[in-house]
């Protein structure tokens, strides 16, 4: 893109991840040749009734079409609340915003069967906000034979690369994923070529299982500060059983989700371990996340010198310490920090990425990295719902 590209302007990005606790939003200004400038951020939580409906839709059931449509409407309403909060805090009107990039809520991800489903009523969202909505980013990559995930590596390469060191950006959301940014890149300001050696894929479960277990036993939505895990001790026999999962042995490109790593998967793995105290299981689930991420980094980025964490797991110091320990145990001399050290608060990274993907859509520029997803080539991602 040239400086002063007509796609330049203010964009909103909304992301509700596999933790399903709510939607994160950012208002950001993109200009060709400059780093993104965040104007405001917001978080809007989901009511328990909506969370329950979304969890239920992840498993086959009766009357799914009706339940899916109603949940999509409810999501659009919450997304609109987040947008209105961004407008208020940034001092903007809808006419000031070029477009809103919204991920939607993943309820099924089956790229091997040729589809992925991110729930949202984008038409309703456009009506409620009077902002152009760009949605459905993953399906074009899947149509081109890709995994449809992860989609954030192109954004990571633009913002977090370094000319001097190999970096890994690790998202610890419901599912963990990594982006490997080889040395020689660098924060590039939109409009510059991406580093074609960027790689990335999903590693395995993160908060999806950690949150599910603490909610089951403490009736809390997440393990605040990792305190529940800190009370326990890792059970190495259980950890070995959890690691005995074919997905962990698959080669990249690969992606996963709650379709695989859910409460049923965990309960099946826990058969024979009923004697363990709940806090010991929690400690072991935390170790599982650290081990699977560290294994993938050791396998694909042995020269990594820094791991920058984003997502909800960035607020869990016990998990971050476990990751640092797991990396060292595999012979990696890599510091672990959050993306705040690079100037981007960890809770903003994914919503920023989807604002950036909306910007790419308006520029009719590719949003995927085909070497990451396995797609036949780079594609313009998303579909437009005009205001």
UniProtKB/Swiss-Prot annotation:
Cited Gene3D superfamilies: 3.30.420.40
EC number(s) given by UniProt: 2.7.1.170
A GO BP entry: peptidoglycan turnover
Pathway membership, UniProt: Amino-sugar metabolism; 1,6-anhydro-N-acetylmuramate degradation; Cell wall biogenesis; peptidoglycan recycling
Record: residues binding ATP: 17-24
Pfam families, per database record: AnmK
Function text: Catalyzes the specific phosphorylation of 1,6-anhydro-N-acetylmuramic acid (anhMurNAc) with the simultaneous cleavage of the 1,6-anhydro ring, generating MurNAc-6-P. Is required for the utilization of anhMurNAc either imported from the medium or derived from its own cell wall murein, and thus plays a role in cell wall recycling.
Entries under PANTHER family matching the protein: ANHYDRO-N-ACETYLMURAMIC ACID KINASE
NCBIfam families registered for this protein in UniProt: PRK09585.1-3, PRK09585.1-4
UniProt protein name: Anhydro-N-acetylmuramic acid kinase
Species this protein is from: Burkholderia pseudomallei (strain 1710b)
């Amino acid at each position: 893109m040239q400086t002063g590209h007509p796609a330049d302007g203010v964009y909103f990005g909304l992301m509700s991840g596999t933790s399903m606790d709510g939607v994160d939003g950012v208002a950001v200004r993109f200009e060709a040749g400059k780093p993104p400038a965040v104007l405001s951020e917001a978080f809007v939580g989901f009511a328990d009734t909506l969370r329950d409906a979304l969890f239920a839709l992840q498993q086959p059931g009766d009357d799914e079409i009706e339940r899916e449509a109603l949940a999509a409407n409810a999501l659009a309403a919450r997304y609109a609340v987040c947008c209105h909060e961004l407008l208020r805090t940034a001092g903007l009107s809808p006419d000031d915003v070029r477009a809103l990039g919204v991920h939607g809520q993943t309820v099924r991800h089956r790229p091997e069967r040729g589809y992925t489903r991110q729930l949202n009523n984008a038409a309703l969202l456009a009506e409620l906000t009077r902002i152009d909505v760009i949605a459905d980013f993953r399906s074009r990559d899947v149509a081109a034979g890709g995994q449809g995930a992860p989609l954030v590596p192109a954004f990571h390469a633009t913002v977090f690369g370094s000319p001097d060191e190999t970096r890994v950006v690790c998202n610890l959301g419901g599912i963990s994923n990594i982006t490997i940014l080889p040395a020689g890149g660098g924060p590039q300001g939109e409009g510059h070529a991406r580093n074609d050696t960027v790689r990335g894929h999903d590693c395995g479960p993160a908060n999806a299982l950690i949150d599910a277990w603490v909610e089951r036993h403490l009736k809390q939505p997440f393990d605040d500060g990792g305190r529940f895990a800190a009370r326990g001790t890792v059970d190495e026999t259980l950890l070995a059983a959890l690691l005995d999962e074919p997905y962990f042995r698959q080669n990249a490109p690969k992606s996963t989700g709650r379709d695989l790593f859910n409460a049923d998967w965990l309960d099946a793995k826990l058969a024979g371990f009923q004697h363990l105290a709940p806090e010991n299981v929690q400690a072991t689930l935390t170790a599982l996340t650290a081990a699977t991420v560290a294994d993938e980094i050791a396998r694909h980025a042995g020269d990594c010198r820094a791991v920058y964490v984003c997502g909800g797991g960035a607020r869990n110091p016990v998990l971050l310490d476990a990751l640092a320990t797991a990396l060292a145990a595999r012979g990696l001399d890599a510091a672990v920090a959050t993306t705040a050290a690079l100037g981007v608060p960890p809770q903003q990274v994914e919503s920023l990425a989807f604002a950036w993907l909306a910007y790419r859509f308006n520029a009719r520029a590719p949003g995927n990295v085909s070497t990451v997803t396995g797609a036949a080539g780079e594609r313009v991602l998303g579909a437009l719902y005009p205001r």
